[in-house]
Amino acid sequence: MGMSVNSDPAALVPEITLLVSAVTGLLAGAWTPRERQGTIHVLAALATVVGLVATALAARQPDETVFGTYVLDTATHTTRAIVLVAVLALIALSRDTVAGHKRETEFVVLLQLGALGSIALAGAGDLIMLFAAFLLASVPFYALAGWAKQGRATEAALKYYLAGALAGVTTAAGVTILFGVAGATDYEKVADGISRGPAAAAAVGLIAVLAGLAFKAGAVPAHFWVPDIAEGTPPPVAAALTTVPKIGALVAFYRLLDTAIPAAAIDWRLITAVLATAGMTLGNLAAFAQTSALRMLGYSTVSQVGYLLMAVAVAGRTPLAQPALLLYLAAYALTNIAGFAVVATTHEHRIDRYRGLFHRDPLLALALTVALLGLVGTPPTAVFVGKLEIFTAAMDGGLAWLVVIAALNTLASLFYYLRWITPAFRPAEDDSAAVTPPSRWARAVALTTAALTLLLGIGSGIVLNALGASG
């Protein structure tokens, strides 16, 4: 890949730390009394902090590959940071939900293993590594989806697993076909092989692999599990499953197409642009009629993936594409977690039940407003800057028609987000109605992530410079 090859496992400190923490937590949890299993949360939180420090140090080093299959570059380092921050927020968000639960340890362990798979997806520079990372980012999250063992959660988990099983088989078939066409698994060698091999067979293999990555990202047409998971599982689980795997999957999407698939052999730009259009449009249309806050957030994540795929569609055509994708992913992770954290705080799943929220808890109502207007892309939130950068990259990459569609979808999305925001600032119809006490940890996460999305938006220029954006 034109990079030096590093055979020192020390280059993988963030990944190793997550793995060791997960295994240690699993073993310790089996012997720790239920009332003391909060120590597993502390261990996991410390592991994420160590991983973030190691990531910051590693980001100063030149780009390289580890064992020739795992790429350490700006995209991988940024993915590490985003995923680890998301895991830290999710550990805190889950505290009120899982404390004292008989499967408390399992939640944290599965979250860490799934996060490890997401990071591995982003760094994969080899087809075999890509498939192994796909499995690691899948199996723990299947189990996490059914963690609560409630009726709706079990149904959602079963749908998620069955769709994932099909996606896994499809991905394996695609990897096999691409290997057969190219005669190699290293991305750069795959690109050379595809240039000389039968384009039709390579296209079939590529579509199969992209179908698997689309499932992990929750992109159309492999998005059907997203609203069911969002509504059927506890909010911390829903937040994890609609945030963490998407990050790695979209970076993997970008790296695979930009490095391994020659656009001259297969017109993957058009394929990706069509997926982006379908995602943002169908996600918005489905969200319009929702009365469930969680289901609305689920469809919202589908539309957000559509916008993110715009950057993938112009990969390699403009230097703005990768920084825009990475900034948007960071902004999306914070904003999406903030939305689910508000629901976890209030314990209210219906939009009309948020009436009077501002009078009961002004700060939480403001956090909800920041989260939802952030998902629209309203300044000064980070999603606004991320979306603006992606629109600019798409224009620079010659996809002006896609920018027009995205702008129209952005305006349309304001309608259903306002349907949730407006009741929060109206007086409650019945002040004497019983209100469930808010979850302390979830409220703290909602306020913190909402504040961070504003800070990231304000400081986005510094972040973009660090990510290598030009101009």
Swiss-Prot record:
One GO-annotated biological process of the protein: ATP synthesis coupled electron transport
E.C. code: 7.1.1.-
Functional description taken from the UniProt entry: NDH-1 shuttles electrons from NADH, via FMN and iron-sulfur (Fe-S) centers, to quinones in the respiratory chain. The immediate electron acceptor for the enzyme in this species is believed to be a menaquinone. Couples the redox reaction to proton translocation (for every two electrons transferred, four hydrogen ions are translocated across the cytoplasmic membrane), and thus conserves the redox energy in a proton gradient.
Signal peptide boundaries: none
Quaternary structure (record): NDH-1 is composed of 14 different subunits. Subunits NuoA, H, J, K, L, M, N constitute the membrane sector of the complex.
Disulfide pattern: none
UniProt cross-references to InterPro entries, sorted A to Z: NADH-Q_OxRdtase_suN/2 (IPR010096), ND/Mrp_TM (IPR001750)
Molecular function per GO: NADH dehydrogenase (ubiquinone) activity; NADH:ubiquinone reductase (non-electrogenic) activity; quinone binding
Superkingdom per UniProt: Bacteria
Membrane topology: Multi-pass membrane protein
Cellular location(s): Cell membrane
Chemical reaction(s) catalysed: a quinone + NADH + 5 H(+)(in) = a quinol + NAD(+) + 4 H(+)(out)
Membrane-spanning ranges: 11-31, 39-59, 81-101, 105-125, 127-147, 162-182, 200-220, 234-254, 270-290, 296-316, 324-344, 365-385, 398-418, 444-464
Keyword Coiled coil: no
GO CC annotation terms, alphabetical: plasma membrane
Record bears the keyword Transmembrane helix: yes
Protein name: NADH-quinone oxidoreductase subunit N 1
Keyword tags: Cell membrane, Membrane, NAD, Quinone, Translocase, Transmembrane, Transmembrane helix, Transport
Lineage: Bacteria, Bacillati, Actinomycetota, Actinomycetes, Kitasatosporales
Family of the protein in this entry: Belongs to the complex I subunit 2 family.
A Pfam family hit: Proton_antipo_M
